[in-house]
Amino acid sequence: MRTLKETSVSFKNIVTLSAVLALLVTAGFARERREVPPLVGSEVGPQMDEIVPKRFIVDPPTIENLGFRWVIEGDSNRNASVAVAFRKKGQRRWKDALPMLRVHHEVSNQAYGPYRTGNLFAGSVLFLEPATAYEVRLTLRDPDGGAPVKPKIIEATTRAIPKAFDGGRTIEATAEKGLMAAFEQARPGDIIQLHPGLYKGPFEFNKSGTAERPIVFRGPTDGEAVLEADGVGGRSRIVTLNGTHHLFFERLTFRNAHTAVYAAKPGGSDGLVIRRCKIHDVVYGINTGCENSRNWFIADNDIIGINPTWYPRPSKTYMSPGHTGVNVYGQGHVICYNRITRFSDSAAIYNFGPPVDDVLKHCVNIDFYNNDLSWAQDDTFEADYGCHNVRFYRNRCYNAHTGMSTQPFYGGPVYLIRNEVYGITSLSYKLNNYPAGILAYNNTTCCAGSGFRPPPIWQNGHFRNNLIMGGSGHALISGSPTPYSTMDYNAYRRNDPDRLIQWTDHRGNRSQYRTLDTFFKATGLEEHGMLADYDVFMKAGPPEQGKTCQPNDYDLRIHKEAKVVDAGVDLAQVTEGFSGKAPDLGCYELGQKPPHYGPR
């Protein structure tokens, strides 16, 4: 949530800066300086170029994706790689997936809580079919030796879309008798059918369903079953879960509470489903900050907060009155096809801080896709405090201070793929607090200010095929302290004839570049980058700062004469099915129908 204001300086100025700090100490101001917590996280192992494969982890699968981690020792020169291929079990032909990301002890959140990431590879196989068994082939190579002779082949199955048990009882619930009276009768596999009416909370459910036989709370098809608490003040919650699992909430209305559904520590909740519900007049919609929460399915909901406006963003109280629409932590969650609006953050990873020591309890393998996210006083999407294989793809974001945030991220990858982002006032990409492991592919982002303006502290980031459009200032003003960060095949808008790029390299040297060619020759970045303008779109202009827009006010599909057609690079699974000589830039391939956003 916090924004770290960064000032990029050359290392040549460190002596001067040190002298100023010494004067402050002499003047007695040192006691006012914030203490940085000690470095925590992974230990640095043996320093050697040869690789030693260690633990291989298959993370809890989601409905469309599989995620993996391969811990290693060595490879200190970072020249090892893991190629990935997959196929449905029983088929013969392998298909390529994206290679695994090399994670190598990057230190995230350096100013507020330094955390050293591990020595590993991490990555996902994307856009798969639900409830389907796959074989995944991982080929580890290292010129310095130590890699297995044969590829590792593992089997993994995507999760099924959750459904009620067919053979359970139906228990009728009425507002007069109360919801708890029906719940006390329920056993795994039952459906509690709520009749229209007002059900006054709070509710704490103390028994669970099972994965095969969940307990389902289902609202009526005619009329509303409304669950409410005591208002947005205090800490009123409608539903609280703590070690209670496999409960489904469907076709219900939640309202008038601080939090609609909360999974508390230490137990959290496994297998929670919230589907086709309406949630409104709340500070938080759905919330868990527990590492033991797993395998949620949050789909097709309308979630509306209490923020009266999204602009201007308050400088000190920007996380109130409405906080976050969907806020999750743990493993295996799916948040899809929701409409979330009028919160400070629309959809987010919970601000957990550094992960616990148990790597199986890290925040991994979480999906956000096909959501409609708007009116965000802070971020439409926030991956802050995630660890590996968090995926944000095919979402529509608009009317927000910030588009996509990763401040910090603990290792990566965090995938940002084919998102439409428009009407941003500050940062399309918020990469503050030294995040590590950002993969941004085929996004279209349109900001009123500079197109790409995160502080020069993001690490191990890789950007391809993006349309990065701004309205004023530099097209690109940023930098990275890791020399292995890469940017190529992206298009930028020149907003100012005298300013194009300001870049701070891994040595701390800041330079200005007036052309992409001089930028490439100096840095090796954007060899195939290009300039573009809003005329590549069917209908769009630079967003005006603070002006509220609606999706029908603009159309970010590209037209067939646009210079960004066929200007991209082929990325396994991401650009599959492109129609021309090469993939197009941005979130929409020419001629392909845009995805559906929000409830179906």
Task: Cite the ranges covered by each PLM segment.
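Right-handed parallel beta-helix
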Residues: 214, 220-223, 245-256, 270-281, ...
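Extracellular fibronectin type III
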Residues: 141-164
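Solvent-exposed loop/turn segments flanking beta-strands in beta-repeat/beta-sandwich domains
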Residues: 73-86
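Acidic Gly/Asp/Thr-rich repetitive segments characteristic of extracellular carbohydrate-active
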Residues: 163-205, 519, 584-587
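Right-handed parallel beta-helix/beta-spiral solenoid domain characteristic of secreted/periplasmic
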Residues: 163-177, 196, 208-260, 531-534
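Acidic, glycine- and Ser/Thr-rich low-complexity intrinsically disordered tracts
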Residues: 169, 190, 314-325, 459-600
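Recognizes extended acidic, P/S/T-rich segments that occur
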Residues: 83-131, 143
